[in-house]
Structures are given as structure tokens and as C-alpha cells.
């Protein structure tokens, strides 16, 4: 019997293990020098002004929206076709998530759809760089600038992504994820990246109890005695155990993303005649991070629905993922917004399937997945 091929597996090697061991032996395992190293390395690699490590991208989104003063009576524009944490945070802050539809084939919002959704109550716009591809930032920034509304880029899928001549995270405000399946992982973690000095200071304050100065003194490895709480804050800091893994992973990003690109190219070659629909890549110049490789399983074309297709792959010892079920189709939001209709999000939500993709996969693994897909579809077409 074949071994189980998971949808994703972190590419953890001896360097990451040694980095964790070094932190454990250092006597300082919470937020400290490895956090500083991670933030510094990210800024140097991508030309960012500020990078603030947090315990998750969700935590990062929370403190960014808090720092921007988002609250009751405000509206925040976001796609529904995203991980539900963004919509949850907006809702928990007492604001209204204004969910807009996406392009059918890139899964990203357009500047036109965002512009139509702007009202006098709009206080932020959160586009998602999807699956490793960048949004059309020029168009989105033009809309946001014209309206005087902050743009917060959800870059959880986009570490190592370029839009035209800039890295994602080089300009503006972006939030990155180091979750277990991401291109750079430390199990759980994230970064808030911004070129706004005031926003960076507030995020640093809010993510660690509201302390008004850097709480870690690198000379004595402890909390500065003069640190004072200047506003209520949260406990969203990242431990050095996690940060040490991310530092090594970040140094390996080019190598790992190159392997992802190789695997995706092979998938695309072998599936080009399949009734499965692959995502389109943006027409504007970009560098794709290939975070996910997704297909759409349309029953009309494939003779099988997505859920059955995923189950049959599981029976063949192949894992898959769903990224994502549109937020407005989830029970809570379905009941809260019963008349909301977003046709492209709904169709993709019902047909999307993420195939196995991670740096330690081999070309033989891709061929195995493709052969299994062909066997399944041949039974239904």
C-alpha cells in the first residue's frame, strides 16, 4: 500500500532543530533576541521599514485594526472568499464586514468591486493576496488613496511574492502568516509589516499588554523596569522558540519557493487537458510564491462533485485541502446576512480543492496525484 501523501508538510530540517535547541539551552525562551533577528532579517530581505513579530497573523490583524481605531459603526471591506478570521475580528470589534465578490479565476477582489462598496462609514480595505499571487495593488491603492481609506494587505499566502517591481511587504501595511502550512513556518506565528511609524508603534504596544516601550531589554534579557502600560493591550507576542524556527525558514525561502514553482509547473503540464479548472495567474508582472495549487471540481464538467472527489483521493492515500469556504456561507454569517449573494465566491467555495504541495514533495509525488485524479475522473466522465 502507498504511504499517505499529505496535503502539506512543513520542511523542517537540522538547521531549524539546532536553532530551537540553541534557544532552549540559552535560558531565554520567550520573546527576545530571536524575535529581533526575525524582524531585522525580514526588513533586510524585502526592504520593509517595520516588521513586528506576533503569535499569529490573526493576532496581527486584530492589533492593526485596533491601532486604526476600527470599532462600532465602522465598515471594513473584505472578500468573503478568505479565511474567516478576518471577518470574525471585524465583527468582534463591533464593526461591519462588507463582503465583496472576487474574480472567478484569480479569487481576488477587483478595484471596481471595492470602489462600489465604499460608503462614508468605510474605515479600511483588506484585499487578500491569494495562493501566492499578488492583488492588483496599483488599482487598489488608487481607489484607497482617492477615498482616503487605509489598505491592509492580507499577505498570509504571499511571503516571497512580488507585484511588478516590489516585494509584497515592501510598501504599505501587510500581515504575514507563519502557520504550519505556510511557505515559511514556525508552527504558529506572524508578522505585521508597515512603513507607517505611528502604526508600528501602536502595534508594538498593543501586542504586548499595552506597554509603551520595548519590553525586552537585550542587555539583561528581561523586562525593562520602567516599562509602563499606556493603554490596555493583548498577549500576542511570539516566543523565541518559534522565532528561531522562522529565522532559519526565512533564510531558506528562495530554495523552498523554487521547489514549489517546479512542482506547480509539473502539475500544470500534466493537468492541462483535464476537466479540472486551474486558477488563472494575473496578467500583470509578478513573482508567484505558489503557496497553494488549487483546482476547481465542477460536477457539470467532471461528473463528480468536489467533496466526493476529495474523499476518493483520500481513499487513494492522498490528502487535500479546502481554501476556503466563503465566510458568508458559514452558519453564523449565513444567518446574519441571509440575503447576501456573491456568485463567484459561492461557486469557488463549492468547487475548490487544494492538491498536495510542499517543498519536500518529489516529481513522482505529483505524478502519483495526477494518475489518481485521472483514474477518478475516468470513472465519471
Swiss-Prot record:
Cofactors (names): pyridoxal 5'-phosphate
This protein's pathway reads: Nucleotide-sugar biosynthesis; UDP-4-deoxy-4-formamido-beta-L-arabinose biosynthesis; UDP-4-deoxy-4-formamido-beta-L-arabinose from UDP-alpha-D-glucuronate: step 2/3; Bacterial outer membrane biogenesis; lipopolysaccharide biosynthesis
Q: Which domain of life is it from?
A: Bacteria
Which reaction is catalysed here? UDP-4-amino-4-deoxy-beta-L-arabinose + 2-oxoglutarate = UDP-beta-L-threo-pentopyranos-4-ulose + L-glutamate
Keyword field: Aminotransferase, Antibiotic resistance, Lipid A biosynthesis, Lipid biosynthesis, Lipid metabolism, Lipopolysaccharide biosynthesis, Pyridoxal phosphate, Transferase
N6-(pyridoxal phosphate)lysine modification, residue list? 182
Any one Pfam family match given in the protein's UniProt record, by short name: DegT_DnrJ_EryC1
GO annotation, cellular component aspect: membrane
Enzyme Commission numbers on file: 2.6.1.87
Q: List GO BP terms, alphabetically.
A: lipid A biosynthetic process; lipopolysaccharide biosynthetic process; response to antibiotic
PANTHER family attached here? Answer: TRANSAMINASE, UDP-4-AMINO-4-DEOXY-L-ARABINOSE--OXOGLUTARATE AMINOTRANSFERASE
Q: Which family does it belong to?
A: Belongs to the DegT/DnrJ/EryC1 family. ArnB subfamily.
What is the annotated role of this protein in its UniProt record? Catalyzes the conversion of UDP-4-keto-arabinose (UDP-Ara4O) to UDP-4-amino-4-deoxy-L-arabinose (UDP-L-Ara4N). The modified arabinose is attached to lipid A and is required for resistance to polymyxin and cationic antimicrobial peptides.
Assembly, in brief, is: Homodimer.
What's the name of the protein?
UDP-4-amino-4-deoxy-L-arabinose--oxoglutarate aminotransferase
